[in-house]
């Protein structure tokens, strides 16, 4: 795992009161969720562009879709009828479909931005550590608060 600390290179506004918390690029038009924002930041900071081999991801909302990172590659579970009935079924299906080699998770500290780059094994450990099955809405969610997530990631930087 690798960490890059950088100043946020793009002008944006965070509006947590919007559904699922949205970011705007301050043009009044471009709204995005956290994962899409992570992708833009990663591209601006690293010169990174999403490919089948590298992906920025958002774990704050619905893991079945990993919407921000995987929707364009059609690797995630995106249809309601495709939803698994058990956590084990979901995980087996997810890992069968997800084949990227580099995963980027971003934590925003206002003007500072930490990018955590993980390989497939580290990403899998991250997902399995924070995943929570919500039987009421038949969804996997990542039970994440940035402080807890960052502490977990920081602990693994030295490994």
Question: Model regions: which residues?
Answer:
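Nucleic-acid endonuclease domains
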Residues: 1-159
């Amino acid at each position: 795992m690798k960490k890059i600390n950088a100043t946020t290179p793009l002008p944006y506004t965070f509006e947590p009161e919007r559904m699922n918390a949205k970011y705007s690029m301050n043009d009044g038009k471009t709204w995005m969720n956290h994962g899409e924002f992570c992708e833009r930041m990663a591209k601006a900071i690293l010169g990174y562009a999403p490919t089948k081999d590298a992906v920025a991801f958002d774990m704050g909302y619905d893991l079945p879709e990993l919407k921000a990172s995987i929707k364009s590659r059609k690797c995630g579970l995106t249809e309601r009828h495709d939803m698994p009935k058990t956590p084990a079924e979901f995980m087996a299906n997810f890992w069968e479909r997800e084949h990227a080699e580099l995963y980027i998770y971003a934590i925003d500290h206002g003007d500072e931005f930490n990018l955590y780059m993980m390989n497939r094994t580290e990403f899998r450990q991250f997902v399995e550590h924070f995943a929570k099955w919500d039987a009421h809405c038949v969804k996997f969610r990542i039970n994440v608060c940035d402080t807890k997530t960052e502490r977990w990631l920081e602990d693994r930087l030295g490994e």
